[in-house]
Every structure is written in C-alpha cells, then in structure tokens.
UniProtKB/Swiss-Prot annotation:
Function: Catalyzes the attachment of alanine to tRNA(Ala) in a two-step reaction: alanine is first activated by ATP to form Ala-AMP and then transferred to the acceptor end of tRNA(Ala). Also edits incorrectly charged Ser-tRNA(Ala) and Gly-tRNA(Ala) via its editing domain.
Main location: cytoplasm
PANTHER family, sorted: ALANINE--TRNA LIGASE, CYTOPLASMIC, ALANYL-TRNA SYNTHETASE
Domain notes: Consists of three domains; the N-terminal catalytic domain, the editing domain and the C-terminal C-Ala domain. The editing domain removes incorrectly charged amino acids, while the C-Ala domain, along with tRNA(Ala), serves as a bridge to cooperatively bring together the editing and aminoacylation centers thus stimulating deacylation of misacylated tRNAs.
Cofactor annotation: Zn(2+)
Example GO BP: alanyl-tRNA aminoacylation
Catalytic function, reaction form: tRNA(Ala) + L-alanine + ATP = L-alanyl-tRNA(Ala) + AMP + diphosphate
EC primary class: ligase
A Gene Ontology cellular-component term: cytosol
Name of the protein this chain belongs to: Alanine--tRNA ligase 2
SUPFAM superfamilies xrefs: Class II aaRS and biotin synthetases (SSF55681), Putative anticodon-binding domain of alanyl-tRNA synthetase (AlaRS) (SSF101353), ThrRS/AlaRS common domain (SSF55186)
Subcellular location: Cytoplasm
Source organism: Lachnoclostridium phytofermentans (strain ATCC 700394 / DSM 18823 / ISDg)
C-alpha cells in the first residue's frame, strides 16, 4: 500500500461514516504555551473538546502534521521520528466507546486486512477512584479478541488528562500490532520495550471531569479523540522492519547515497537515517505557514539543533559543500502536492538552510578540534566539566545536547548541572551589562534620544502594518545620532516596502498626534492590543504609550508629547542582524 492510498483510505472511510475532514493545522500550536509544537491531531481541537461547537459538526477526521522532540537522541533506530503524520478521528459528544472501538476494529481488519490475531489491546485496570473499564474490555471481546490479547494497565499506560489540576480526562485503549517476535518473559506485553508489540492506534475516552477535591464526575458531553501513527502503520502494511524502508524515506535516502558516492565518502547507516529524518522535519518546520526560523530559543532552538546535527554528521566524512538544500528539494517535491505550503515557501526554506549552514560551518571544524582537545583532558573519571562544555557553546555555538552526543561517542559524560550553572552566570552578566550600557534601550534620556525613542514606536507600528502582525521587535539601540531597530522578519525588505514604512511614519509626524500614556495591568494592556516584548521587567502595572492610529506599546518611556516634535523620519540602512531578524537604522529631523 502506498502512502497516498493509506491517507485517502483513512479519510474516505470516516467520511462515509459521517465525519467531516479538517485540514492539518500549523506545527506551531495556537495559544498553547505549554508545548513548543503541535504534537497530536487533538491540539487544534482543544476548545471543541472542552465544549465549544465546531463549525464542521460533531464527527471529524484529519491527517495532522506533528513534531515531537523528546526523543531526538533516539532518532536513527527503527521507530523514533521527530516529524510524523497522525491520522485522527473525533466524536464531540456523539458516539463513544463501543462505536469508536467498532469503527477502529473494522478499519484495521476490513480496510487494511490486518488479521485480528495480530492485534493486542490495552485497557484501564481501575483503581480506588475510577473502576476498571469493563465496557472497553467487553467490546474488544465481542470482536473476537482472546484474553491473551487484552492487557490491563493503570494510569501510567491507560489514562489521559487532565491537562491541568482539574478538567476533562478519562481512560484510553491502545491498539498494538504483534510483530511476531518471541515473548521476552512471562510479563511480556505492550507496556514493555522488547519490540514484540508496536502501538498503532490510541482511542481516548474523555468521560470524566476531575474536580478540585480530586474526585471525578461524569461529563455531560463525552468525547472521543483517536490518533493513528501513519508511518508505523505504513511500515507494517508493507512488511518492512523499519520506517526508513518505506517510500516516505527512499527518495531522500537515494539522493543522499548519490551525494555520498560522488564525494567518495562513507557514512554509517545510523548517520544516514538521522540526516534523512531531520531534513524532512526541518523542511516542514521551515515551510510551515508561520515560518519558524533557526534561533537560540524555543522552536527556533530545536530547528537549529536539528540542522546543526545534520551538518555535523556530513562533516564527519568531509562532505563540505552544503547538500542540505539538495536533500530538502526532494522533500518539497515529494510532499508539495499534499502540503502546498512547502512549494509556496520553497525559496524561504532554501535561504534559511543556506544561512544556517554558512553560520555554523565556519566554526564547526574549529569547534570539533577543540572538543577533541577538551575530551582528551577529562582524565580517568571521563567527565567533561561545566567550564569546558560551556566554552563549546559560547565560542563555537555547540548546543549542550550536541556536546553530550559528541561526548557519548567517546564514552564521556558531560556534567550538565555544572554547565547549567555556567550558562546561568553568563545570562546574569549579559543582563547586567545591558542594563549598564543602555537602560531601556536608550543611551540617555536627553531630548534627542527621547525623540528617537518615539520614532522607534512609529517604526514598529509601520512595519507591522506593511509586513504583517507577525513582525515583532527583537531589540533596539538609540544614540544621539540615530536609532537602530531589530525585528523578526525572514527576508530583505523591498524598496517599495521601505518607502511605504517611511511614508507611514512621516504621515504620523505631519498629523501632529498627541502621544498618550496610561497605566494599566499587563492583562488590560494585552486586551487593548498593546505590543511589547519586555513586559516581565515592568511588573504587574505597566505604562502603555499610544499614538492613536499608529502605535500601542508597553514601554517605560520617555516619549515626546506630540509626534510633530520628530520633524521627519528617514531610513539609512536595512540589513540582516541574524537568522530571521532584520535591522533598520534611521534618523529624524533636527530641531
């Protein structure tokens, strides 16, 4: 069975049973600070699982792009992936356990022709608060599963939620495929890691609401949330032992082999797998509609880590030229008809890969040489201290996970706690230095710097008007002569865009607008629509400076009383500051 056939078969099957298809959401979850990426098909549906009405009804189906980063170091084995697709179906208050299991069982045995003897399932065994899930157990038995195919586990294996201290939660039943390997012992089952059982589908039943006192009550609207591992099922259906044998990885693996052969190099099978897996994940992250860029924090940090890991494996065998773009093009070609954003953002993907390669390759060789010197210094205890591991980060840009991976190849342990202490000291010094040099981004509070400070607010507002509201300030510096403003954006501004930014700022100056200031809570400021990336330093009550029609920002000040005091505004230079960050230098008219 091909990948496209499996996707289509799944969606069509559920459509025939009254489900409406919903498109894959972004890899960046909407309004969920608890996770970096969309890790399951349920992420975009959380409000509806909590009771809101979905515009497409109560039965839904999707193929969702997902990224999970907890097992990056495991990538290269037979099963672990950072990027994957999840097939999912949902019932929002309609069908429940019996119908959900019946639908799942029918799809597996009738559509995919998996013999029921190859299935194993897990069921919640019950505890002092919630009884054993007999309904699930009896439903599976009614399908012909024998007692030795049904395994009972506690909350660690067969319970979902709540996300916080209280809220929706419930039991689940996981469906496994028996790979035919011999049992590892008398207690062998789906919960062990011997490889006999591979999980392919999970049905979560949101039945209870956990109350503040720790007790549970039945929910009025009971929901079903299911997720099937697309890559795993495709591997099993085609009789392969690992996901890298499937058509999902063969095109990029073949291209990588061509490059290796052309360079007369030799690369281990694990390194090949890491590169093929990571280039797929990186291509989807860079190609996401929200355009993630490599950086040193949050999603950008994970992206940078994946890219640098690939570069390191390629450099190991002296493949010097940047082949990442060649590999990424294979992914775009392969998936572009299904996920059109990859083709739409192909140029951006290639630009970012080139930039990150150029940025890292300059220091990688020196860094690897120094890492070897540091490893030679560890002595018999085979522990790399915090000072040396921090030097690799501070001087050569090696993420700590990167250093750990290098060290493990030489059977050396990294003192991560000592590294974290050094890193914290570095951050503290950096913050103190910044406060001494430019308090609030200003070199002083003189008349000229105050005028330029107000100009940065107008510039920020104009950039968001011209380029979009996903543009955010990334830093600023003001002297007597000019302002310097850094902002998140992925490419050079066109001449027309810069001219429009200038026009908007000068329009605000000509309109002679009073600059208003109000004190309010951070919550009130956000509800007002104020922007600001430095809220944490201002406390609970903040000042919001407003230039009506042009700007609302949380800020410590100071500012001019009227925009006319700026006289005029002109950009002097627009350039790259770092990956995904642009910089504008500008001046204003003299008094």
């Amino acid at each position: 069975m091909t990948a496209n056939e499996l996707r289509k078969m799944y969606v069509d099957y559920f459509k025939e049973r009254g489900h409406q298809e919903i498109a894959s959401a972004s890899l960046l979850p909407e309004n969920d600070p608890t996770v970096l990426f969309t890790t399951a098909g349920m992420h975009p549906l959380v409000p509806y699982l909590l009771g809101e009405n979905h515009p497409k009804g109560t039965r839904l189906v999707s193929v969702q792009k997902c990224v999970r980063t907890g097992d990056i170091d495991e990538v290269g084995d037979d099963t672990h992936l950072t990027f994957f697709e999840m097939l999912g179906n949902w019932s929002l208050g309609e069908y429940f356990k019996e119908e959900s299991i019946s639908i799942s069982y029918d799809f597996l045995t009738t559509c995919l022709n998996i013999p029921k003897e190859k299935l194993a399932v897990t069921v919640f065994e019950g505890d002092e608060l919630v009884p054993r899930d007999e309904e699930v157990s009896q439903t599976w038995k009614s399908k012909g599963l024998q007692d030795n195919q049904i395994f009972y586990y506690g909350r660690e294996e067969n319970w979902w939620g709540p996300a916080g201290q209280t809220g929706p939660c419930g039991t689940d039943t996981e469906i496994f495929y028996d790979m035919g390997k011999p049992s590892c012992g008398v207690n062998c089952g789906p919960a062990c890691d011997c490889g006999k059982y591979v999980e392919i589908w999970n049905n979560v039943f949101m039945q209870y609401h956990k109350k503040p006192d720790g007790s549970y009550e039945e929910m009025k609207q009971k929901n079903v949330d299911t997720g099937m591992g697309f890559e795993r099922v495709l591997t099993i259906l085609n009789g392969y032992t690992n996901v890298y044998e499937t058509e999902l990885f063969l095109p990029v693996k073949n291209r990588l082999d061509e490059i290796i052969e052309a360079n007369e190099a030799k690369l281990s099978e694990k390194s090949k797998r890491i590169i093929c897996e990571h280039i797929r994940a990186v291509t989807f992250l860079l190609g996401d509609p929200k355009m993630i860029v490599p950086s040193n924090s949050e999603q950008g940090y994970i992206l940078r880590r994946l890219i640098r890991r690939m570069i390191r494996h390629l450099k190991q065998v002296s493949i010097e030229n940047n082949v990442l773009c060649k590999l990424s093009k294979v992914i775009v070609e392969q998936y572009g008809s299904i996920y059109v954003e990859l083709r739409e953002n192909e140029l951006f993907i290639m630009e970012q890969l080139e930039k990150e390669y150029d940025l890292f390759s300059k220091t990688l060789d020196r860094g690897l040489k120094n890492a070897k010197l540091y490893f030679d210094q560890v002595g018999e205890e085979k522990i790399l201290n915090g000072e040396l591991s921090f030097k690799l980060y501070d001087t050569f840009g090696f993420p700590i996970e990167f250093t750990i991976e290098l060290a493990s190849e030489m059977e050396i342990t990294v003192d991560v706690e000592a590294y974290n202490q050094k890193f914290a000291e570095h951050q503290k010094k950096s913050r103190q230095g910044a406060e001494v040099k430019f308090k609030g981004g200003l070199s002083d509070h003189g008349e000229q710097t105050t005028r330029l400070h107000t100009a940065t607010h107008l510039l920020n507002g104009a950039l968001r008007t011209v380029l979009g509201t996903d543009v955010f300030q990334r830093g600023s510096n003001i002297t007597e002569e000019r302002l310097r403003f850094d902002f998140s954006f992925h490419r050079k501004l066109t001449k027309e865009e810069l001219e429009e930014v200038e026009r908007i700022v000068n329009e605000a100056i000509r309109n002679q607008i009073d600059v208003l200031c109000e004190e309010m809570t951070v919550k009130e400021a956000k509800e007002l629509g104020a922007v600001g990336i430095f809220e944490d330093k201002y406390g609970e009550v903040v000042k919001v400076y407003m230039i009506p029609g042009y700007s609302k920002e949380i800020c410590g000040g100071p500012h001019v009383k009227n925009t006319s005091e700026l006289k005029s505004f002109r950009t002097v230079k627009e350039e790259a500051s770092s990956a995904g960050v642009r910089r504008i230098k500008a001046v204003i008219g003299s008094n």
